């Protein structure tokens, strides 16, 4: 959109959708089981798009979090424009955004995972005067049949290269998709923990992200 993601506005989102033939919008948000949930919207017209971007959409909180009772389960998921990205896997042109939870009174859901984290970060800042920087990483195993060619040494796979590391290309493809979706990647590499057992190769890989600065001003949950 020609500007840093943190500066994205509703007008930017609407303009991008209009100019790039985007036909669908996805809202995504984590539930109590730790998995991302998805709500799909077809863009009917400009007014409808403006409505969902402004007001979000109602969801059944009791189906998302075990601690919310069915009798008072109305929650709203409101998109954070700074998280917008083109879905690299969608066959229909789709713009996806992560959302924050709000209760029926328009207040941030106090028990929502992201809001809980932001409150903790604000308390940390108030007590210490320091800012908290979080740096995450993905560590995973790729499991495949052992073809017996150029075997890697067990537990010696740190920063290994092909042909001893078999799945570097898969890792770099994953990194490209993550970057396309707005992820800020520091680097990727093969990890120590590779081994072979029962005719299968287990290769450990890592994708590490750049530090992210969480500012207390984001407590409102709309940035």
Where are these regions (language model features)?
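ATP/Mg2+-dependent ligation/transfer catalytic cores
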Residues: 1-190, 207-211, 215, 219-222
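Short, conserved helix/loop micro-motifs enriched in His/Cys and acidic residues
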Residues: 193-205
């Amino acid at each position: 959109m020609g500007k840093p993601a943190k500066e994205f506005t509703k007008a930017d989102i609407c303009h991008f959708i209009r100019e790039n033939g985007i036909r669908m919008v996805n809202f995504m948000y984590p539930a109590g089981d730790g998995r991302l949930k998805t709500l799909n919207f077809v863009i009917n017209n400009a007014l409808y798009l403006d409505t969902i971007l402004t007001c979000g959409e109602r969801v059944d909180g009791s189906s998302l979090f075990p601690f919310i009772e069915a009798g008072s389960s109305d929650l709203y998921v409101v998109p954070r424009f700074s998280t917008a990205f083109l879905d690299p896997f969608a066959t229909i042109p789709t713009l996806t955004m992560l959302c924050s939870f709000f209760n029926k009174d328009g207040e941030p859901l106090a028990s929502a995972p992201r809001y809980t984290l932001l409150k903790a970060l604000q308390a940390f800042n108030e007590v210490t005067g320091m800012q908290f920087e979080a740096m995450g990483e993905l560590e995973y195993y790729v499991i495949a049949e052992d073809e017996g060619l150029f075997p890697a040494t067990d537990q010696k796979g740190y920063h290994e290269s092909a042909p001893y590391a078999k799945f570097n290309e898969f890792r770099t493809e994953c990194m490209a998709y993550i970057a396309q979706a707005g992820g800020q990647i520091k680097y990727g590499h093969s990890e120590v923990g590779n081994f072979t057992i029962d005719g299968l190769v287990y290769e450990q890989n890592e994708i590490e992200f750049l530090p992210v600065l969480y500012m207390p001003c984001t407590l409102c949950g709309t940035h």
